[in-house]
């Protein structure tokens, strides 16, 4: 796959963009598609590379940074999406969502589809293919992709696969088997061709209405992020902390009052006991005095 001919500028090109969170193997997948190491791991900006496949197709692969990572700002995301589109003359022919069978589905993956639809428009699912990296992991376990998907497939993944018509493919980016390398690329390109046929040969973002839909998506995303930015971080947690602080303060005040009341009650009780004891002693003294006087009178008589 490394001895492919270089494409000419006049030949038709299929633009394939790789999206997904950082660490799922987008760059390695791009290298597998191109047939050589052209994309660096953990890229921080959109990169593109053209290549001619063994069957003569010209593909333009766009590797994107982790646009759906939770730490990515809206400004950065929009800038890179625009950058991505400038690298795709003729529109997008396929959007490949890259996931990994070696890691659990995280919040980034679950948020990816919503962000894709907001940024690229609702038509995105008509151009979507789900690509799973980590084929080497399943091979070691003697498992297939269907085996992996059947063992507790998350609802998010079921939804994505249903919306994109079940288009999926497994990649082993670590294999040295040339036959496997060619076969997995063929499988992905077969999905790309099916997408093209499904959409009547029309690519995404080739007409003004497509671009308008994308702009509307960008505006919605910006508005959503602006609203979120105005909210204090972890609002529920902060509110809970405030309530706990109030509750704790109230409890401490109540305890302090109880201690004070107890001490007062104890002091009052102690004082009452002393008065009672004093009264008892005085009464006993008076009684004894009366008895003593009575005895003296009896002796005189």
Curated annotation (Swiss-Prot):
Q: Give an example GO cellular component term for this record.
A: endoplasmic reticulum
Chain intervals for the UniProt region annotation (G1) = 20-27
Q: Which Pfam families match?
A: AIG1
* Region (G3) residue spans: 63-66
Q: Which CDD domains match?
A: AIG1
Q: Keyword set for this entry?
A: GTP-binding, Nucleotide-binding
User: Which InterPro entries does its entry note?
Assistant: G_AIG1 (IPR006703), GIMA/IAN/Toc (IPR045058), P-loop_NTPase (IPR027417)
Location of the AIG1-type G domain: 11-214
Q: In which tissues is it expressed?
A: Expressed in pollen, cotyledons and lateral roots.
Q: Which GO terms describe its biological process?
A: cellular response to heat; endoplasmic reticulum unfolded protein response
Molecular function, one GO term: GTP binding
Show the segment(s) annotated as G4. Answer: 133-136
Region called G5, residue ranges: 172-174
For the ligand (GTP), the binding residues are 20-28, 173
Q: Which family does it belong to?
A: Belongs to the TRAFAC class TrmE-Era-EngA-EngB-Septin-like GTPase superfamily. AIG1/Toc34/Toc159-like paraseptin GTPase family. IAN subfamily.
Q: Which PANTHER family does the entry link to?
A: AIG1-LIKE PROTEIN_ 48352-49494-RELATED, GTPASE, IMAP FAMILY MEMBER-RELATED
Task: Kindly provide the name given to this protein in its UniProt entry.
Answer: Immune-associated nucleotide-binding protein 5
């Amino acid at each position: 796959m490394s001895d492919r001919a270089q494409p000419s500028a006049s030949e038709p090109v299929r633009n394939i963009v790789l999206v997904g969170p950082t660490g799922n193997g987008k760059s390695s997948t791009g290298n597998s598609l191109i047939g050589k190491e052209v994309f660096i791991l953990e890229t921080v900006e959109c990169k593109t590379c053209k290549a001619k496949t063994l069957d003569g197709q010209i593909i333009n692969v766009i590797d994107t940074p982790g646009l759906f990572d939770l730490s990515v700002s809206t400004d950065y995301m929009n800038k890179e999406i625009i950058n991505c589109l400038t690298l795709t003359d003729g529109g997008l022919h396929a959007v490949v969502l890259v996931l990994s069978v070696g890691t659990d589905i995280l919040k980034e993956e679950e948020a990816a589809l919503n962000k894709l639809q907001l940024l690229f428009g609702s038509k995105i699912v008509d151009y979507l293919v789900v690509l799973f990296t980590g084929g080497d992991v399943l091979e070691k376990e003697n498992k297939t992709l269907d085996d992996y998907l059947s063992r507790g497939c998350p609802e998010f993944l079921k939804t994505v696969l249903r919306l994109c018509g079940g288009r999926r493919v497994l990649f082993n980016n670590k294999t040295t088997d040339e036959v496997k390398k060619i076969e997995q690329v063929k499988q992905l390109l077969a999905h790309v061709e099916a997408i093209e046929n499904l959409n009547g040969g029309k690519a995404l973002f080739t007409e003004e209405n497509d671009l308008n839909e994308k702009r509307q998506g960008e505006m919605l995303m910006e508005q959503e992020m602006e609203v979120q930015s105005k909210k204090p971080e972890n609002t529920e947690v902060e509110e809970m902390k405030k309530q706990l602080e109030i509750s704790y303060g109230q409890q401490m005040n109540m305890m302090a009052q109880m201690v004070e009341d107890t001490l007062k009650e104890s002091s009052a009780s102690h004082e009452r006991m002393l008065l009672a004891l004093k009264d008892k002693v005085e009464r006993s003294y008076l009684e004894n005095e009366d008895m003593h006087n009575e005895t003296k009178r009896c002796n005189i008589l």
